[in-house]
Amino acid sequence: MKEKIISEINLDLVFQCNNFSQFSNKLKDTKTNLIFESIFWEKVFLSWINTILKNEDYELPNYIFDKKSFSLGLQIISNQEIASLNKKWMQKNGPTDVLSFPIISDESLNNLDHIELGDIFISLEMALEQSYEYKHSIYREMIWLASHGFLHLLGWEHNNEHDLENMLNFQEYLITRLD
């Protein structure tokens, strides 16, 4: 792997989280409460951007590696809201765990100093269900879903089993790199 030293990265994160007080009995520990904090997610995404930018071997658009300023949106929403987005934009019925809407689409972004990556939407209700199903914490599930959405913002797709396996492995790699 070819690793390089990078200077400071700037991230503008727009974070929104609905009121999920109905789940407060399931979200008791301090670590879990971090998922509702903008500063937590800013640190997570900055860590992932730094990890990616330090290594040019990743399959990402080349112009990403020259940038130092990024922005993205993250919204933690309900099943009802994500089902509505899923129907409108993906033509699929029902809720899903995570949706991402990348803005990066062509090389014209190459000339910009600041890159708007796009938006990630995560259903807290689906994340809770999946954390029970997979027998890990809601914190872990939210990080997993955010990493999946983030990679989609960077142009990753999983149209076949091989691509999906590579993406899931890279998600795990990013998660293990969190400070």
From Swiss-Prot:
Cofactor(s) it depends on: Zn(2+)
Entry-linked SUPFAM superfamilies: Metalloproteases ('zincins'), catalytic domain
Broad class of the protein's primary localization: cytoplasm
InterPro entries, sorted: MetalPrtase_cat_dom_sf_prd (IPR023091), YbeY (IPR002036), YbeY_CS (IPR020549)
GO BP: rRNA processing
Residues spanning the membrane: none
Highest rank taxon of the organism: Bacteria
Enzyme type, top EC level: hydrolase
Protein EC: 3.1.-.-
Residues annotated for Zn(2+) binding in this entry: H148, H152, H158
Function, as annotated: Single strand-specific metallo-endoribonuclease involved in late-stage 70S ribosome quality control and in maturation of the 3' terminus of the 16S rRNA.
Record protein name field: Endoribonuclease YbeY
Organism: Prochlorococcus marinus (strain AS9601)
Gene name linked to the record: ybeY
